[in-house]
Curated annotation (Swiss-Prot):
Subcellular location: Nucleus
Quaternary assembly: Homodimer.
Chief location: nucleus
Alphabetic keyword roster: DNA-binding, Nucleus, Transcription, Transcription regulation
Organism of origin: Arabidopsis thaliana (Mouse-ear cress)
Protein name in the entry: Transcription factor bHLH28
Recorded GO MF terms: calcium ion binding; DNA binding; DNA-binding transcription factor activity; protein dimerization activity
Gene name for this UniProt entry: BHLH28
Amino acid sequence: MINTDDNLLMIEALLTSDPSPPLLPANLSLETTLPKRLHAVLNGTHEPWSYAIFWKPSYDDFSGEAVLKWGDGVYTGGNEEKTRGRLRRKKTILSSPEEKERRSNVIRELNLMISGEAFPVVEDDVSDDDDVEVTDMEWFFLVSMTWSFGNGSGLAGKAFASYNPVLVTGSDLIYGSGCDRAKQGGDVGLQTILCIPSHNGVLELASTEEIRPNSDLFNRIRFLFGGSKYFSGAPNSNSELFPFQLESSCSSTVTGNPNPSPVYLQNRYNLNFSTSSSTLARAPCGDVLSFGENVKQSFENRNPNTYSDQIQNVVPHATVMLEKKKGKKRGRKPAHGRDKPLNHVEAERMRREKLNHRFYALRAVVPNVSKMDKTSLLEDAVCYINELKSKAENVELEKHAIEIQFNELKEIAGQRNAIPSVCKYEEKASEMMKIEVKIMESDDAMVRVESRKDHHPGARLMNALMDLELEVNHASISVMNDLMIQQANVKMGLRIYKQEELRDLLMSKIS
């Protein structure tokens, strides 16, 4: 069996070789070797990348639409070693104990969601207490596990939809890209974000320095992750390399990923492929890649015109060997479809899964969420519930006021029906009396009354207006023979009447 370290050296040589058409990858499962490929990209290139994330195609848990979700990630920190003192001073000023505790809790929840054990962070014995804290860049990397991108949304979604790399360099382009996640990366100091698509997903690289890679690097990285389309020539500007605009809004959503792949994080160290590295992610039992001895010759004196001949000469020497399984692979069965847990560990996982689904449901009903963490979600939910309570109280008060008005009108109608003689008199009076009401504005009205001049109709009109709490702005009375015409401009107070309602009330009180 060929040593795995030789395979890793072979991948590094592939990334650092001279510009030329790359070799076709061997038939190797991407899932089993994805951590090694990410390590090879970070260690095999000269650019100071801070992290590498591979977004793989999947489906949304709720809508069922095709999205890009977290597949795997490796964090190195880039050139943070050079600015450790500056970062330490910044954390001392900006980080509070509550923020540190909140970030620690989120890290523990992410780790329990993944594997149920302590997060694999390499401790630095020579560093002080501040060096073991989570920096803003590390926090941005960890929170990326909860992101997903729809078709054509976000930098990764655009790269996967167009099958062309997306590169933004400089703070102006990052903040002007229209992507919320890119803007958050600019807040933590990112100056370059690169997304390279392949058939299996999208590789995202980021750095705190401005980097302008060439198309040869794109081709080699795409080859490493199972791509087949190559780019010709190095771009002169961002517009030549990326034909589409980045001004469109980023519609990426934050969703919980119940089963993300582990995050490989080293505290202030670059990841490498040496056998002594304690945080090197070993691929599970599966295929092991070996190119053989002739691969070294393929990197010398290669001609693009004889590329097909090189494939025929090199590929037969590539060997895919299967490691011997040492026994049945242990692992927990999925909890779906099982009512009772197997043990207390499985019960705890099922409980956390139910709790996460409840948080997803709560997130769906709360209209405005300030942050993506659970604490902020609960605070926003409490504020929203209090707002609904206040609205319900206002509706109850309005309902009570309407009931009071209805009861008063009901009493007036009962009094009219209780005395037949009064009703007859009112009918007779209504025949001789004509009342017109016109609502001028929201609270102003004009009243016109035509009646006989007997029994002091002017006094009765003023008494009716006083009973109805109407303020008289102007009034006039004119008499022609036995006919009296009264006009009054009134203003409504606390009670607002409709036109027919005010006419009926005046008719009942005057007659």
